[in-house]
Amino acid sequence: MKRDRDRDREREKRAFSNGAVSSGKSKIWEEDEEEKPDAGMDELLAVLGYKVKSSDMADVAQKLEQLEMAMGTTMEDGITHLSTDTVHKNPSDMAGWVQSMLSSISTNFDMCNQENDVLVSGCGSSSSIIDFSQNHRTSTISDDDLRAIPGGAVFNSDSNKRHRSTTSSFSTTSSSMVTDSSATRPVVLVDSQETGVRLVHTLMACAEAVQQENLTLADQLVRHIGILAVSQSGAMRKVATYFAEALARRIYKIYPQDSMESSYTDVLQMHFYETCPYLKFAHFTANQAILEAFTGCNKVHVIDFSLKQGMQWPALMQALALRPGGPPAFRLTGIGPPQPDNTDALQQVGWKLAQLAETIGVEFEFRGFVANSLADLDATILDIRPSETEAVAINSVFELHRLLSRPGAIEKVLNSIKQINPKIVTLVEQEANHNAGVFIDRFNEALHYYSTMFDSLESSGSSSSASPTGILPQPPVNNQDLVMSEVYLGRQICNVVACEGSDRVERHETLNQWRVRMNSSGFDPVHLGSNAFKQASMLLALFAGGDGYRVEENDGCLMLGWHTRPLIATSAWKLLPDSGTGAGEVEL
């Protein structure tokens, strides 16, 4: 008898995995089709006592797969009547029976959700998630709790995707749905079409819970976010995963160690430079303003508040070398943070630039200064020479916003700039308000901003673009550059969302906010000309997905955005006639 039961189970398994009418060799199949009372039924399943029409096989297979996953995840929740050990013999309507089982499960889950009050608010549509609340939680939280956020979701891994059955065959396993019950609450994705909308709603609901200091609800929601993110693809999955990590760190109070460590950030920024046009646009537009300000000057001095790898200056040096009447003497002062290994990275950059200057025939002088913050810099050591003999330009790219984390720091630096009395100050900043005092406002702004930024990265990495202007197209983006660029932006997200106080240095503000600050500090805007606008637009033709980038002129400033959303802004400034003390009177 046992052997017969085993044989029957084996035949049943083959019937389910095949999911189609077999061409079997038994004499059963030789009967006249017209004489069968159940014509149209799947014959292989009919032998086992199940009445299923062949046309319904795909639907039954899908429902059985959902039922199998639901039954597997409910065993730990004490729902005994759905145990996989229960035997259901020969239902006359298999499709209806399976549907009733699923409906029963859904009802139980809905009751469970109501009791535990973990539904996401603001989602008016029917739930696409059936979730199980854990009745116990660990009393301590550590780095291990971040395993609820699937790190693999950053990459396009097919193994992490949930597939919905569309054919008559189906798998009897659900390994892709299995998660560690101690790490996440098990879910069943019934309808993936609404998952993207639900993911955004869950992110915002989690941020609202954090704002209200309801950390229990926030903990439950952040686990949902990690699971929902895996079901997405492309930019949405990546940006959601970074926001989930940032929220988890804030909830569990596991703050990133040295999250904005300078040397690593510099390396990541180099990859960001290669991947998309934002930094190139920043360097190009700032250089154009500096070049025009230096017209007719025989000696020029640029003070770079963020030298990093010095990628901005070869283009300016080459432009100066081609100037009618010969190039001016070019002096560059680079400011940068100390390196963890105490290497003199600034001098290495200066040495490379000196080699280039010698090649193109430009008289060149370089000095580097190390400072933890621009506010710590003593302007008297910059060797400012009289303005009659040397024109000075001050350049800041993605740097001044970091001063907003220290009270009075930005005012001190702007006052020092006034004492230096430069011909021009070029300022490039992110076009976003990530410095709001209310966390939920800052979170929502960051979510929209970085979603757009990741979307543009996704386009840059998809293909190379052919330029309609005849310029050679940009080669396809290296995959390593793309991934490291995502990490570069992800670290910013983590700082904006997870950190507070002086540790939160990514305090981006909008162009209008910088206008108010610069005007109140005694600076007057310098109009960036139409020539810079045209050349910046041509620059975008070099990049994949160039059609999505937009250059916009805004009251004399230039902004680069993706489709309709501005993302960075370049502005230029000069001192008002009655501001500053003039060269030779530098003081703090």
Swiss-Prot record:
Name where it's found: Nucleus
| Motif VHIID per record, residues | 300-304
Q: Where is this region: VHIID?
A: 269-334
Enumerate the InterPro entries for this protein: DELLA_N_sf, TF_DELLA_N, TF_GRAS
Compositional bias per record (Low complexity), positions renumbered to this chain: 166-177
GO CC annotation, single: nucleus
> One GO BP annotation here?
hyperosmotic salinity response
Annotated region (Disordered) at 1-38, 152-177
For this chain, one GO molecular function annotation is: DNA-binding transcription factor activity
* Chain ranges of the GRAS domain: 190-574
Q: What is the reported tissue distribution?
A: Expressed in both vegetative and reproductive tissues.
Q: Where is this region: SAW?
A: 498-574
**Motif window: DELLA motif:** 42-46
Q: Which UniProt keywords apply?
A: Gibberellin signaling pathway, Nucleus, Phosphoprotein, Repressor, Transcription, Transcription regulation, Ubl conjugation
The segment annotated Leucine repeat I (LRI) runs over 197-251
Q: Where is this motif: LXXLL motif?
A: 400-404
Q: Specify the superkingdom.
A: Eukaryota
User: Which residues does the annotated region (PFYRE) include?
Assistant: 392-495
What are the Basic and acidic residues biased-composition ranges?
Answer: 1-15
The main place the protein resides is nucleus
Consult the record and explain the modifications the protein receives after translation.
Answer: Phosphorylated. Ubiquitinated. Upon GA application it is ubiquitinated, leading to its subsequent degradation.
Tell me the segments the record calls region Leucine repeat II (LRII).
Answer: 348-380
Briefly state the protein's biological role.
Probable transcriptional regulator that acts as a repressor of the gibberellin (GA) signaling pathway. Probably acts by participating in large multiprotein complexes that repress transcription of GA-inducible genes. Upon GA application, it is degraded by the proteasome, allowing the GA signaling pathway. Its degradation is not essential for germination.
Q: Know anything about its domains from the record?
A: The DELLA motif is required for its GA-induced degradation.
Q: So what family is this one in?
A: Belongs to the GRAS family. DELLA subfamily.
The protein's name is: DELLA protein GAI
Traced from the root, the source organism's taxonomic lineage reads:
Eukaryota, Viridiplantae, Streptophyta, Embryophyta, Tracheophyta
